[in-house]
Amino acid sequence: MLKNGLINKNKVMEQFDSTSYQEKIKEDKLTLVKYAANWCGPCKVLSPILEGVLKDFPNINAGEVNIDIHSDLAIKDGIRGVPTVVFYKNGVVVDKMVGLQPAQAYSQKINSLMN
């Protein structure tokens, strides 16, 4: 696995900390951040869904923020429930998906944001 929130060749999402989160969301490329918690059942279901989707999008940054550890990031971004997937570009939120959704919804969203 790679550090700083990058996904490895197996597309496993890394845990973002405050530093890696700030670095990645400010990049010019699309960054997907999954806000989740260890106690959240739907968050656990979402992980393999996103890993599968991300195989088709190797050129985006992707990572996860554990809201129990980094509640400051969740509060800053107005996260009110998990799972929530937020898309950033150049440090700006460009879209958000709340709740567990099918893989196709995430793929379509990423496609629309990359065009």
Residue ranges and their predicted role:
Residues 12, 36, 61-63:
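Conserved Rossmann-like nucleotide-binding pocket used by diverse enzymes
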Residues 1-12:
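Short, Lys/Arg-enriched N-terminal segments with co-localized hydrophobic residues
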Residues 27-30, 47-65, 71:
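Conserved helix-turn-beta segment immediately C-terminal to the redox Cys motif
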